[in-house]
Amino acid sequence: MQWYLSVLKNYVGFSGRARRKEYWMFTLINAIVGAIINVIQLILGLELPYLSMLYLLATFLPVLALAIRRLHDTDRSGAWALLFFVPFIGWLVLLVFFCTEGTSGSNRYGNDPKFGSN
């Protein structure tokens, strides 16, 4: 839960770097929260996904900021995040980038998050 909350605290922090662990732990918890919200909507019998849409809006900027910081960790520009808008191929490329180990030591986006804070 600490990984999830730390990303939310850095709500619009687009600079710096994010480790794979931070990215994937946030993504996992985000998916679990989304699933719980969907179950609640089913129980309440909501025809339109109001709660899901509200949650997506609330987490859009933190998810985008985290994705950009993750790209920075691999020494890539945040502009690569535009691949989110290219179905399948773009998502596959981003998946590879997000799974790639970050550059060791400092890079143009900051210090290595494995060895201290940015």
Curated annotation (Swiss-Prot):
- Enumerate the subcellular locations listed in this protein's record, separating them with semicolons: Cell inner membrane
Q: Name one GO cellular component term.
A: plasma membrane
Superkingdom as given in the UniProt entry? Bacteria
Which residues does the entry place in the Periplasmic compartment? 1-25, 69-77
Signal peptide position in this chain? none
Q: Does the keyword Cell wall biogenesis/degradation apply?
A: no
Where's it mainly located? Answer: membrane
Q: Which residues lie on this side of the membrane: Cytoplasmic?
A: 47, 99-118
Report disulfide bridges, numbered on this chain: none
Its membrane topology: Multi-pass membrane protein
TM ranges are 26-46, 48-68, 78-98
Look up keyword Transmembrane and say if it applies. yes
Give the record's keywords alphabetically: Cell inner membrane, Cell membrane, Membrane, Transmembrane, Transmembrane helix
Q: Which family does it belong to?
A: To E.coli YhaH.
Protein name, UniProt field: Inner membrane protein YhaI
